[in-house]
Amino acid sequence: MRTKIVCDSTMTGITALLRPLYVAILLLMSSGFDAVADHGPQTWQAAKQSVLLVEPTWPGYARPGFGAPPGVAPAGTGIVYPLRAGIGSYILTAAHVVAKAVNIEVVDAAGSRYRARVHGIDHSRDVAVLHVDQVFPPITLADGDPATGSHVCALVNAFGIGISFTCGVVSATGRSNVGFNEKEDFVQTDAAVNPGASGGALVRADGQLIGMIDGIFTKEADIDAGVNFAVSLPMIEQSLDAMRVDGVQF
């Protein structure tokens, strides 16, 4: 890229006078950005206990592993969702992760494994609900729609190696006709998302849930290009309502 530097000697004195003010403004701006960007540790602490690894076993496939190569079932992520309390835990994940599974395990931060079963599934929105007997702390749901440009973070089982934490912004809301699901209402984000992230949590800076990670746009294989999509919280609630209509009880 070509850069052209313009030098005007008549402005030298004015520039010298304005420089301290300019520097002060920059310092104020940078300190403000640091305050916003520094929410990461608090966001992580608020949500980490409510996000689990999901490891399905598919017929004819080995157990999930790094990168889910051919012949290995894809690893995924799950969100402990606040449904009926006191009877185990309900875990939200992407339907495409568990739809073919003959066995499902969820793994917590300590590495403990728990047998899970599909309690309800909605292929049209790519939402599934698992149930485990173990009680985990549910995630807190956000109120209202996320604002475009607001800071968000993703807690996901990237490449099947464990829960990781990435942050970005809300790039857009209300995305539909993207081509992943029959019924779509996505929150778009540039927070890094990779294979294994499906079913992961997209949260606000306060750790409250705004969506479930579902898909990415990319030109090459499964490489993150910063155009990533999460099923919106209203769409998740629609999916749960549809399951209830079909007789699923929570």
Language model segments and positions:
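Bacterial N-terminal signal peptides
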Residues: P20-S31
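Conserved active-site neighborhood of the chymotrypsin/trypsin-like protease fold
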Residues: P59-G60, P82-S164, D246-Q249
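Bacterial N-terminal signal peptides that target proteins for export
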Residues: T3-Y22
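A conserved glycine-rich beta-strand in the N-terminal activation segment of trypsin-fold
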Residues: A37-Q42, P59-I91, S112-R115, P137, ...
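Flexible, gly/ser-rich surface segments that form the specificity/activation loops bordering the active-site cleft
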Residues: H39, G71, V97, I139-D185, ...
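Catalytic nucleophile loop of clan PA
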Residues: I79, A192-I213
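C-terminal cap/linker of serine protease catalytic domains
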Residues: V36-A46, A154, A205, L209-F250
